[in-house]
From Swiss-Prot:
Function: Converts molybdopterin precursor Z into molybdopterin. This requires the incorporation of two sulfur atoms into precursor Z to generate a dithiolene group. The sulfur is provided by MoaD.
Top EC class of this enzyme: transferase
This protein's name: Molybdopterin synthase catalytic subunit
Residues at which substrate binds: I36, V37, R38, N97, T98, K113, K120, C121, Y122
Keyword line: Molybdenum cofactor biosynthesis, Transferase
Subunit structure and binding partners: Heterotetramer of 2 MoaD subunits and 2 MoaE subunits. Also stable as homodimer. The enzyme changes between these two forms during catalysis.
Keyword Coiled coil among UniProt keywords: no
Example of a GO biological process term: Mo-molybdopterin cofactor biosynthetic process
Family: Belongs to the MoaE family.
Gene name tied to this protein: moaE
Source organism of this protein record: Helicobacter pylori (strain J99 / ATCC 700824)
Pathway(s) of this molecule: Cofactor biosynthesis; molybdopterin biosynthesis
Catalytic activity: 2 [molybdopterin-synthase sulfur-carrier protein]-C-terminal-Gly-aminoethanethioate + cyclic pyranopterin phosphate + H2O = molybdopterin + 2 [molybdopterin-synthase sulfur-carrier protein]-C-terminal Gly-Gly + 2 H(+)
GO molecular function: molybdopterin synthase activity
Length: 145
């Protein structure tokens, strides 16, 4: 399941809901990653732009891969502004055992960072500053793709 949320994530509620689902399904592994906007220089927060249609397509392809290992993938990401010390990203991999859930972690995050159509801007002095250093070309993007 993919959730796109305006502003900061309510990680307490999301984690509670996902953990209840894991317990209902009798899963023994509940692996969580939470991305928190950290203080850096004079940055007051981050702002995210998401190409929702592409993100949903990417996530649907990715979501089916863990099923073969008995793992369920949940992801939530912010769109818009998120101030420092608030969460912008949550990923949960849950399954019957830890081995399979942890096996997918590194691969998922590498793939997410390279292929998810999410762009980041720094919020500084009431301006959005595009984070060009963090950007890369998406496979299959561009006019001649």
């Amino acid at each position: 399941m993919l959730k796109i949320v305006q502003g900061a994530l309510d990680t307490d509620k999301l984690l509670k809901d996902y953990q209840e689902e894991a317990c209902t399904k009798n899963f023994g592994a509940f692996c969580v990653f939470v991305g928190i906007v950290r203080e850096e220089g004079n940055v007051q927060g981050l702002s995210f732009d998401i190409y929702e249609a592409l993100l949903k397509t990417w996530f649907e392809k990715w979501r089916h891969q863990p099923k073969d290992l008995g793992v369920v993938l949940k992801m939530a990401h912010s769109v818009g502004d998120v101030l420092i010390r608030h969460s912008s990203f949550l990923c949960v991999l849950m399954g019957a055992n830890t081995k399979n859930a942890l096996k997918l972690y590194e691969y998922f995050f590498k793939n997410f960072k390279r292929n998810a159509p999410i762009w980041k801007c720094y919020l500084s002095d009431n301006e959005r500053i595009y984070a060009k250093k963090k950007d890369h070309l998406l496979k299959g993007s561009g006019l001649l793709a």
